[in-house]
């Protein structure tokens, strides 16, 4: 398999991340993709999964056994709270010919737990930390890899134009740690900017705030950054909140009180509870003003 590409690629979970990866990889030359998703028959979600499968010519299977039979490389792309369960449900059907990669946004210790589960079967394990939003770059989104099989995994996908960097071959969890502790800054900044414009807009003070910030942090277009970040928060607040819960849990395991991580999760949950994802049809608003206007039209404004 190494160096020859991927003949049969499988996905556990076929949500947004898996769909966009499959789309990019199919267009880049992967010949066969299959997926198993526990929600494939759930009203509402099931129809979306089937539409995505049709668009990417991905075969949907009914059981984990069928997924393992139809794929050599399997990527787990489920919600963070389902990562361990997904591994446990798949491992009975894995053999030494399989490679199982976990790209879920979970803690380093959860990655280690998944690795322990998977390697019992003789299958090889790779941890993946996705270092940016998968659309619009699809499979070319930067990713960090970890695990003894990481170099082979990178080589297998290289011909498709992927951007993968191996950060460790002897320690599972390092790639996840890079992403996780970067999130303290990145998602913390999203929460800070959202809270800033929520307050500043009540006095028409945003432009002055941005100008003042630009003096102290030259090179950053703060208005543009606010437009970008606020839109992402209202569309993906729920997912971001759960990721920050994982960060907080990891910090607690290390004996560090997660003051900032927990506060960020609260603001993300607040944003998700506004229900603006549906207002914008799941698409990102172009400016933070669109978000503030939508909030003002609702009766739920209580920052």
What are these regions (language model features)?
Residues 1-69, 94-97:
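NAD(P)+-binding Rossmann beta1-loop-alpha1 motif at the extreme N-terminus of oxidoreductases
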Residues 12, 36, 76-77, 128:
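The conserved SAM/SAH-binding core of class I Rossmann-like methyltransferase domains
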Residues 65-125:
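Rossmann-fold NAD(P) dinucleotide-binding segment
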Residues 106, 110-187:
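Rossmann-fold dinucleotide-binding core
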Residues 178-284:
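Helical "substrate-binding/catalytic lid" subdomain
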Residues 281-303:
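Short, basic/aromatic-enriched C-terminal tail that caps enzymatic domains
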């Amino acid at each position: 398999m190494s160096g020859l590409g991927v003949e049969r690629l499988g996905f556990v979970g076929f949500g947004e991340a898996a769909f966009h990866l499959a789309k990019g990889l199919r267009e880049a030359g992967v010949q066969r993709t299959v997926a198993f998703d526990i929600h494939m028959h759930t009203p509402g979600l099931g129809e979306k999964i089937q539409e995505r499968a049709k668009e990417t010519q991905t075969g949907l299977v009914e059981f984990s056994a069928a997924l393992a039979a139809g794929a050599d490389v399997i990527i787990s792309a489920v919600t963070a709270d389902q990562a361990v369960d997904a591994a446990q449900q798949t491992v009975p059907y894995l053999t030494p010919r399989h490679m199982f990669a976990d790209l879920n946004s979970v803690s380093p210790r959860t990655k280690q737990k998944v690795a322990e589960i998977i390697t019992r079967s003789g299958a090889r394990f790779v941890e993946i930390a996705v270092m940016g939003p998968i659309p619009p770059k699809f499979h070319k989104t930067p990713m960090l890899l970890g695990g003894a099989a990481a170099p082979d995994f990178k080589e297998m996908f290289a011909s498709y134009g992927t951007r993968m960097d191996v950060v460790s071959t002897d320690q599972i969890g390092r790639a996840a740690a890079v992403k996780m502790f970067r999130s303290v800054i990145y998602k913390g900044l999203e929460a800070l900017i959202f809270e800033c414009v929520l307050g500043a807009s009540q006095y028409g003070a945003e432009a002055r705030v941005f100008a003042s910030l630009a003096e102290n942090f030259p090179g950053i277009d703060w208005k543009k950054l606010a437009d970008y970040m606020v839109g992402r928060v209202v569309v993906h607040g729920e997912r971001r909140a759960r990721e920050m819960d994982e960060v907080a849990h990891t910090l607690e395991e290390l004996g560090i009180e997660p003051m900032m991580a927990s506060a960020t999760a609260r603001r993300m949950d607040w944003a998700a509870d506004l229900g603006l994802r549906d207002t914008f049809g799941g698409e990102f608003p172009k400016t933070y003003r669109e978000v503030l206007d939508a909030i003002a039209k609702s009766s739920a404004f209580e920052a």
